[in-house]
A protein has these predicted regions:
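Core SAM-dependent methyltransferase catalytic element
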Residues: 210, 227-246
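Class I SAM-dependent methyltransferase SAM/SAH-binding core
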Residues: 50-52, 56-103
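A short acidic, Gly/Pro-enriched loop at the edge of an enzyme's catalytic core
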Residues: 102-113
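Short alpha-helix
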Residues: 194-211
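Conserved class I S-adenosyl-L-methionine
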Residues: 1-45, 58-62, 142-179, 221
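A short SAM/SAH-binding and catalytic strip from SAM-dependent methyltransferases
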Residues: 113-126
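A short glycine-rich, Lys/Arg-flanked "PGG" loop and its adjoining helix->strand segment in the class I
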Residues: 127-139
Length: 246
């Protein structure tokens, strides 16, 4: 995995700005995200939750506020430091663990729920990651992954066409980038496998081949007219949820 250390270094530089975005989301978008997670949460009871690629701990703090036991897991030490800070400000406690999402340091069947947001596109071995996540999930537990086709434009004409739309944004909000140059991660993304495939179709096919008995996907589409006057529809972001076989 030639790129993993370069990926870690980049996200360490992003930790401060990404933490500001997490604090903003916890203040302004908590209800939206709770509504998206609620179908996978019990009405009562405490779950053992693993937040993979937790970053500054958005999902970790959100779910800990509900009383669940959360392990915040990330490869980047700067992100874990911010996750602990954000948890303290939210008045909750987290367990943090540093490691590779493609090779988890947990025993089989350790968690009731696994959540992840904006991680899998970064991975060099995403199929291995999904297998690992299901390994540490308990039978009947849910894996819920939010991600997007962030670098699909490198290999797909419709996604490249979207970049020419007058209202296009690349997601790098200057208020949260704090002057960090995204060029390193842009270059890395060109060599990552998920930049080359259509998602969540790839994710569904991969998870169906593993220990799952139920898969659900929700997509956020972008519609526009390209420079040739043709109507185009692309999937920008998505949620995919899988239940491990009981």
């Amino acid at each position: 995995m030639a790129e993993i250390e370069a990926i870690r270094r980049y996200w360490n530089t992003r930790a401060e700005g990404y933490s500001l975005k997490t604090a903003y989301d916890l203040q302004h978008a908590e209800t939206i995200w709770l509504d998206r997670l609620r179908p996978f949460l019990p009405e009562s009871g405490r779950l053992d939750v693993l937040d993979i690629g937790c970053g500054p701990g958005f999902f970790s703090s959100l779910l800990a506020r509900l009383g669940h036991a959360v392990v915040a897991f990330d490869y980047t030490e700067g992100m874990l430091e911010r996750a602990l800070q954000n948890a303290a400000e939210a008045g909750v406690e987290l367990e943090v663990s540093q490691g590779d999402a493609q090779s988890l340091p947990f025993p089989d069947a350790s968690f009731d729920l696994i959540v992840s947001r904006n991680l899998t596109w970064n991975l060099e071995q995403p199929e291995r990651a999904y297998a690992e996540w299901l390994r540490v999930l308990r039978p009947g537990g849910s894996l819920v992954n939010f991600d997007g086709n962030h670098y699909r434009y490198l290999y797909s004409a419709p996604y490249e066409e979207e970049r020419h739309q007058p209202d296009y944004t690349d997601g790098h909000d200057p208020d949260f980038m704090l002057g960090v140059d995204p060029a390193p991660i842009n270059a890395i993304a060109a060599n990552l496998p998920l930049s080359r495939v259509d998602r969540p179709q790839w994710d569904m096919e991969t998870l169906l081949a593993l220990e799952t008995d139920s898969i659900r996907a929700e997509v956020e589409r972008r519609h526009f007219v390209n420079e040739q006057g043709q109507s185009v529809s692309i999937i920008k972001n998505f949620m995919i949820a899988a239940r491990k076989k009981a």
